[in-house]
Every structure is written in C-alpha cells, then in structure tokens.
Amino acid sequence: MKRREFLRYTTLGGLALSGSGLLVHALAGRHSQTLPAALLDNASIPAGQPLQPLPRIVNLSDQVGRFHSVLTPAAHAVPVSDGLEATLWLYNGKVAPLIEVREGDELDITLMNELDQDTTLHWHGVPVPQAQDGAPWDAVASGESRHYRYILHRGSAGLHWFHPHPHEGTARQVAHGLAGALLVRPRLDVLPVEVEEHLLVVSDLRLTTEGEVASHTAEDWMNGREGELLLVNGQRAPRLDVAPGTTLRLRLINACAGRYLRLRLEDHELTLIGTDGGLIERPQPLKELLITPGERADLLVRVSEKPERSFELASHPYTRGWMGAKPTHLDEIAPLLSIHTLNAGVSPAVKLPNPLSHIEPLGEPAVRRQVELAEVMPDHGDHGAVNDTPHAGHGGSDSHHGSHGRGHGGSHPSDEDRAVRPKVDFLINGRAFAMNDVLFEGQAGEVEEWDVFNNSHMDHPFHVHGTHFQVIATRDADSEWQDAPWLAWKDTVNLAPYQRLRLRMVFIEPGDWLFHCHIIEHEELGMMATIRIS
C-alpha cells in the first residue's frame, strides 16, 4: 500500500482557522535548506490570548471503562500569524491533544502512520506490557498501522504523555510537534472540588520565516534542541482570568526536547502536590521548581486576594552546561502564563487532606547496579567516560543502526542531518546504544537499587521505561550522601554535573526496557541502554 500524506489545517497560538478547507500536499522528498534559514522569533506569535484547554481525542467506544480511538500522525498546515502557516506533524491535526481515562479503564488505540518515515507511540510514564511500550524495535512503517491495547491498573493515576520513539527518528519528529497528554484520573479524587484545574503542555518550536521546521544544528545535537518559540498548549504566554483567592491546580508536562523549565510565579509560593507517578504524601512549599524534559509537575497555587492584578508564571535562566554558541534566550526570563485576578469576590481557601496519598518505601534491594552517564569527545578530550571502555562508535555512525532480530530499525537520519551531528558519543557505562545490546538482566518483582552517576559537565534527565522509581538519596559533587527530602514515584529525574542519585524500583512486566537521557538528541546520539527482565 502506497503512503499518502495529507497536509491539513489546525491552529497554533489560539488563531482562528484560516483557508478554504483541506489541502493535500505530497511532502515526500522535501528537504530543508542547505544554508541556515532566517528564523521566526517569539514575538512573531501573538501573546496574551485566553488560555485554551487541550484539544481532546474523542472516545469512539460506547462501552463503559473502555477508551478506543485512532491516532494519525501526519503533516498539517498550522496558522502561526497573519499570512504565515507552519508545517507541523501532529496527531489527528491537534496541537498537544489529550486522552482522558480513569484507573481500571482499557485503553485501545490504533496508530495509523501517515508520515513519510517510521514512527512509534510511546506511553511515557504508564506501566504497560512491554509489547505496548512503543519502543524503537517496534517501529510502525510509513503507511502502516499498529494496535496498542492495555489496562490502566490501580496506581496508574497521574498526568502522563505520549510521543514518538523510533530509532534515530525521535528528535526530528518531536521537533515537528508530535506529542500528546494522557490524563489518568483516580477512582477516588481526594482533592476538594473547589480547586480549579488546568493542564499545561509546555513545548517549543524552531520555525523559519517561511513556516518550515528548521533543521537541527550541531549545537542542537550537543546540547538538546531549544526552539525559539516557547508555547503552552500551543499558545504563546496565554492569559488565565480567575477570581481573587482562587486555588489553582496547574498540572504541567515538559514536552520539550532539551529545554529545562525553572518555574517561578511572581509574588506567589508554589506548592508541589504530585510528580510523574501521581500525588506525593504531603504538599511541599517551594519558591521555584525545576522541571526537566519529560518530567511532570502537579502544583497548587492560591492566587492573591487582590483584584485586578497580574502575575507571571515564567521559566528563569538555568545553567546546564551548554556547549558551543549560546543562544540569547538562555539568559532571558521566558513567560509561560499570565494569571489575572478579576474584579470579583474573594474565593475562600481550601483545605487539603493530610496525607494526600500513601507511598510505601521500597525495601532492601535484591540487586544493586552502577549506571554511569558520560560523554566522549574524540576531538576535544574526554568528558567523563573511561577511554579504554568499549563502545559502539561515534554519534551518528552506522554502529547505532542494527536491529538484529528486533524488527526494523526505525527512521534513519538524512545525509544533511548526519553531516551536522557532532563527533561525540553520549554513553551509558561506556557504551552507546545499539538495538541488539542488552546492558543488564533482571527478574520481575525484585527490588533493584541503581546508583546513577552523571560523570559529565552537563545536566542529564534520566528516564526509565516500564516502571516508576523512588529517589532514595542524592550526592552532589564533593559532598556526602543525603536522604531525599520526600518520597515520590518518578520516571524521570535530573542529574546535575557529577551528581549521583540512588534509585529503587521494581519491574513487574517482563521484556526489554529502555533507560536513557531524556534530552532527545543525547538519547539519539547513544545515551540509552536496555535492561532485560525475565
């Protein structure tokens, strides 16, 4: 069956739908420009429009407790500003679409691939059977389909998300906009009904002035791509109007490839009530919160009682070991959401249950493992890894391609893309990812303790598929081990340069599970490995 790729219309930045209906374009063979193109800056997109809820994926099932739909990744024309449209890759023509289900439901999704390359559908943060994980070795070819079906078991409540995970194609697909939110509601919600909830998917884009997604640069591959256009639910710095004293629940996903979010809310304290795996035991008051790529945060804020005031939720500069030419936005405060209090009566404060949840600490481990994250730069010296440790070749080399019995190997980078990839290996335990390589073997149901060491000069967010973990202790460079301040179920956690984390986890489902840096470009250049669970 020949693939047909449809270029459809949707919206970005809250702009109204434009044009005369459906456009059909053959995009096969289109290449990005050889010379650097002029880029669209953040000011080109209108800001301050009312915050829009995430567009929903419609449930096609009339059966209680079952969610069935079809997700179609394809190219779409998206109005960006007056007279300019961008070509993005989206699920069902929607920017950051939402699937909402409940614990105990069956999720039944058919993926119809209308891209011109392989893709997968990875359910980030959801404990699923290995065959449903959307791993690189389960790629869906262009024009083909794949069925994902699993039960959302007890304990799966939380804000998760889905995104592509093909071998050597993830960075390009994420850069084109492919991502969505998966909200799993608990069977019993312990938060008061007076709390006003908003889901916020933070993403970024880099577009040329002609509306094309700009190609990756060498700096993108080295550091993780940060697009100049910072978006919340597909909008630039939207506005949220609330009554004074409103208690807001802001549930955030950092869906960026490489951008860190150092969140502060002007004149307000943030209260953390949940992380990747759902609610924590007790609220944690914070002045600011760092959210790395792939992480989620569940925040409560009681807005000022003063009417007709504005407060900015913004991401502040964060130093994460940037290499090469430094973009100006790294040193700038980036507004995400403007909260405005209305001229209205004051909403009363709400009382939270105490505790919010119960998290049982994992017991003594049956196995302990050492995990080292490092970079090897042959032309510029070694950034942490041991040079005589065998590894699988330099970033972008053919050594990362082999599938060796695991299905086809995914999307291969273009010649242009390969040309700008730096000659650097991002490694786990001295090895770059290969499809046929299994680093660890373990047993289902056993408590594992991993000491993860970031032996490099830059931050790396560490993500584990197939389970959640507890951060037991941390050890910064030149310091002693410190117990973690609170327990949480996590699937992604940051490691600062030369920091160590002690994680405990239990794999329930057998199979091959990935763990990797969630800076997408680092993952694609080799900082990914596999554990096989029997």
Q: What is each of the regions a protein language model found here?
A:
Residues 7-27:
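N-terminal export signals
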Residues 254, 265, 315-319, 454, ...:
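Short acidic, glycine-rich loop/turn motifs
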Residues 6-8, 320-330:
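Extended, hydrophobic interaction surfaces within ordered domains
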Residues 123-125, 131-136, 140, 272-283, ...:
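Active-site pocket scaffolds in enzymes
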Residues 17, 27-300, 321, 331-380, ...:
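Histidine-centered copper-binding motifs that mark active-site loops
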Residues 160-163, 306-319, 508-521:
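Short, surface-exposed ligand- or partner-binding patches at beta-edge/loop junctions that are enriched
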